[in-house]
Every structure is written in structure tokens, then in C-alpha cells.
């Protein structure tokens, strides 16, 4: 998710929050340690991150946290975790969380794929995968998240009826993801625009708002765990 796309938020000019604030909101996990020793890290779950049993939703590539912070404000009985590889946008997300006194949101700086071993079975209510880097060429394969492996891991981690929300601005990449989802019979595919909109929140991510301002067409589908 770190590949630049338009006005990438990693170029933001923002100072780090105070250490005690970072300690509360941010888990900055070393990728090598996470890859080799995942058992030494916290489980990515509501009990581990929030010390409660509230439903958990995760935003993959959360950027400045616009989506998860807004959702957390609107849904105080749901926990939210934003995952991002770039630090500066997370600084902005954390500062907003502090200013608005949002207690049910946390952030992880790492590659989401490394979190698979840390996601307990049936522990997640919803996954947001909005505006990923389009992976249509071999040289971009290092950015690939949406795959058969991803769908298997998310199926394990999602509760029955849990959802994966996918939105993309790439007419080339979107059909690739949709075909993968459609071929996985463990999920129900919802691709009708009106039905998707009815299931989606009004809140938008950084990229969603950015591409709206550019007038760019967007494509979406939802996968529901059977």
C-alpha cells in the first residue's frame, strides 16, 4: 500500500505526537520481527487492543484514518483498527483521534499480510479494502494483498455474515479482484451498486474523498462470509 498514487498522504508535513500519545494509539511493528516471530506480538483483536469484547472492524491501508476515525465516532460500541505502511498519515490520524477524544480506534504500522497469524478465528466483523494500489503488472506484485490467500485468511478471521468491502478507482484492476471474489464459493458476492451502497457507511476514506474531488469513477463490491 505504500506505492504513491496521486497526492499520496506519506508526503504530509506533520510532526509526531508526544511519546505517551503514540504509545496509546500506535503499534509500530517491525516487519522482520513480525515475519519471523509473530507469536511475540499481540493478537489483533478487541480483547488485546481494547480490553473488551466489542465487534472489531479493520481498514487496510487506512492512510490518514479518515474512514476509521469517522466510523469510530459514529459507532462507539464498535472497535476499529487502521493498518498502514506509511508513518506520517498515521501521525495525522492519531492527532485527530486525540483532538476528538476517540477511544475506540487504534493503528498498526506494518504490512497487513504479516498480521494473518495474529487474527483470531471469527474475530472480525468487517474488513475495508478501499482504493488499493492496482496490481496489474508483474513489477507491482509486491503490493498484492487481494489474493486467494487473502480471501482464505479473511474467511477464517471473519464472523459468519462478516463482510469485506472493496472499492477501487481502477477499471483494470477491479475486475481481477471481483473475479477472485466471485470464484470463492465461501462468500456471497454483492456487486449491485444500490445494494452495496445500502450496506456501506456514508463515511469516506482519504482516497475516496480525493478521487471524488477529481470526478473519477469508482467500482465496488462486497463479499459476505457464508
Swiss-Prot record:
Catalytic activity: guanosine(46) in tRNA + S-adenosyl-L-methionine = N(7)-methylguanosine(46) in tRNA + S-adenosyl-L-homocysteine
Keywords for this protein: Methyltransferase, S-adenosyl-L-methionine, Transferase, tRNA processing
Annotated Gene Ontology cellular component terms: tRNA methyltransferase complex
Enzyme Commission number(s): 2.1.1.33
Record-listed S-adenosyl-L-methionine binding positions: 59, 84, 111
Alphabetical list of InterPro entries matching this protein: SAM-dependent_MTases_sf (IPR029063), tRNA_(Gua-N-7)_MeTrfase_Trmb (IPR003358), tRNA_methyltr_TrmB_bact (IPR055361)
Residues binding substrate: 169
Gene3D superfamilies, per database record: Vaccinia Virus protein VP39
Coiled coil, from the record: none
GO molecular function annotation: tRNA (guanine(46)-N7)-methyltransferase activity
Pfam families: Methyltransf_4 (PF02390)
Pathway given in the UniProt record: tRNA modification; N(7)-methylguanine-tRNA biosynthesis
Function field: Catalyzes the formation of N(7)-methylguanine at position 46 (m7G46) in tRNA.
Family of this protein: Belongs to the class I-like SAM-binding methyltransferase superfamily. TrmB family.
NCBIfam families cross-referenced by the UniProt entry: tRNA (guanosine(46)-N7)-methyltransferase TrmB (TIGR00091)
Protein name: tRNA (guanine-N(7)-)-methyltransferase
Amino acid at each position: 500500500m505504500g506505492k504513491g498514487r496521486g497526492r499520496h498522504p506519506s508526503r504530509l508535513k506533520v510532526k509526531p505526537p508526544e511519546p505517551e500519545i503514540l504509545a496509546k494509539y500506535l503499534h509500530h511493528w517491525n516487519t522482520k520481527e513480525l515475519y519471523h516471530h509473530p507469536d511475540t506480538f499481540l493478537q489483533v483483536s478487541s480483547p488485546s487492543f481494547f480490553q473488551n469484547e466489542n465487534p472489531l472492524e479493520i481498514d487496510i491501508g487506512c492512510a490518514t484514518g479518515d474512514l476509521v476515525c469517522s466510523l469510530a465516532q459514529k459507532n462507539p460500541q464498535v472497535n476499529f483498527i487502521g493498518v498502514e505502511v506509511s508513518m506520517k498519515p498515521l501521525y495525522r490520524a492519531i492527532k485527530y483521534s486525540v483532538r476528538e477524544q476517540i477511544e475506540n480506534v487504534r493503528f498498526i504500522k506494518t504490512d497487513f499480510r504479516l498480521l494473518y497469524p495474529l487474527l483470531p478465528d471469527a474475530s472480525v466483523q468487517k474488513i475495508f479494502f478501499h482504493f488499493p494500489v492496482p496490481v496489474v503488472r508483474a513489477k507491482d506484485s509486491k503490493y498484492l494483498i487481494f489474493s486467494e490467500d487473502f480471501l482464505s485468511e479473511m474467511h477464517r478471521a471473519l464472523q459468519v455474515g462478516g463482510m469485506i468491502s472493496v472499492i477501487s478507482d481502477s477499471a483494470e484492476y477491479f475486475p481481477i479482484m471481483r473475479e477472485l471474489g466471485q470464484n470463492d464459493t465461501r462468500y456471497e458476492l454483492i456487486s449491485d451498486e444500490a445494494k452495496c451502497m445500502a450496506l456501506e457507511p456514508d463515511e469516506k476514506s482519504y482516497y475516496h474523498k480525493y478521487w471524488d474531488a477529481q470526478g473519477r469513477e469508482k467500482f465496488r463490491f462486497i463479499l459476505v462470509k457464508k
